[in-house]
Amino acid sequence: MSKAKSPIKSSKKSVNQPKSVLREKKVKDAEKAEHISLQGHVDNSDEEGQDKEFFPGFGSSDDDEEDSPNALVNTSRQIMDLGEDAEKTIKKKVSENKNLQKKKGVLYVGRLPHGFYEKQMRMYFSQFGPVLRLRMSRNRKTGSSKHYAFIEFESLDVANVVAETMHNYLLYGKLLQCKVIPEDQVHENMFKGADVPFKRIPHATIARLQHEKPLSKEKADKLITRHNRKLKLKKRKLKELGITLESDVSHPKAASPVASKKSSKKKNKKVLAAHK
């Protein structure tokens, strides 16, 4: 009988190669790895160069997410610059039209990105020309930006150049909407509160102080009378069910005064006086 072949395949024996051949292989592998890493570095630098061409003067940042209403973007000069070519073009346009119109120009700017607030806007748009007044619309309760603002320039020509240059300009992931407002549409209260730091109204503090304010005797009597009337109706209903309830509401005892700091008292008085 013939012997059955074992199911286990025999592994190929490794051929012993001379040391010189192994050294050459190692050198070739190292050169190949170095070439791949250099190629990847060149590709990355090309992508960065393209980004700079399309978006001059802006850097990419991962900190542009909305986290808190008071978060600010990087306002360094490198990020806020328009770029040499754009700045030359703008100055040329302004110099061509500077003798035409001397009246002021008002610009509407919409779709403002998160973190691009009054300080950043003044820094940015001052590159075009002197900014006289600037007001960004904010929520009265929270103080959050409504993402649009009004800017008054010294010259109407500058405002026209800004509207032409910056309309649909990509800024921190948002396309700016710029439009010159005609003089007859500029409202007298459009710049009310401009260049004044926004102060959030402390609604919680005001409500707490109003709640903790001691009641007058007349108001306390009124509250007790109303509560006793409701309690009387409840007693009648419980009596029909066979339950007797003996209780009444009277004037509470005067609470002992709690010692508080003078500074907090003064602060609370100022808060109440400012928002009456």
From Swiss-Prot:
Domain RRM span(s) in chain numbering: 105-183
Which CDD domains does this entry report, sorted A to Z? RRM_NIFK_like
Keywords from the named record: Nucleus, RNA-binding
Q: Name one GO cellular component term.
A: nucleolus
Q: Which Pfam families match?
A: RRM_1 (PF00076)
The keyword DNA-binding appears for this protein? no
Q: Where is this region: Disordered?
A: 1-70, 249-276
Which residues lie in Basic residues bias regions? 262-276
**Which residue spans traverse the membrane?**
none
Record localization: Nucleus, Nucleolus
Task: Name the residue ranges with Basic and acidic residues bias.
Answer: 21-35
GO molecular function, a single term? RNA binding
Task: Specify whether Hydrolase is a keyword of the entry.
Answer: no
Q: Where is the composition biased (Low complexity)?
A: 252-261
The alphabetized list of GO BP terms reads: assembly of large subunit precursor of preribosome
Entry protein name: Uncharacterized RNA-binding protein C1827.05c
Native organism is Schizosaccharomyces pombe (strain 972 / ATCC 24843) (Fission yeast)
